[in-house]
């Protein structure tokens, strides 16, 4: 993402051929993560808009273009980290905010609607990672101001 939108860039298959550049969506896009959160076969895009700014949205492909279908409603200052994957087999976006509530939260699509849950507050996540193991999943969070790395363990 950039101040001019979100672009999909593909390198050439053969050396010397042209790169392919396609504009995916407009807007000031700071960070993105993709997953098919609603299991319709098409990946949705979670964005931080603009770079380290105060909006987190989910966009869905509708009639050939990505349209905003979800906005994180909590007041945000310095949205900083996104990751997507599956948490105990369910598609998920996980996001972190560095100021105000400094929360770590996730969004899932359950029974036809987006469900948001705050995992922790006051932690200022700078980087996130999701690891799937056989009997549990791990959410890793590098919490900036606290100078700590935290592992949240999610089991059935």
Model-found features: residue ranges?
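Beta-propeller-forming repeat regions
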Residues: 1-156
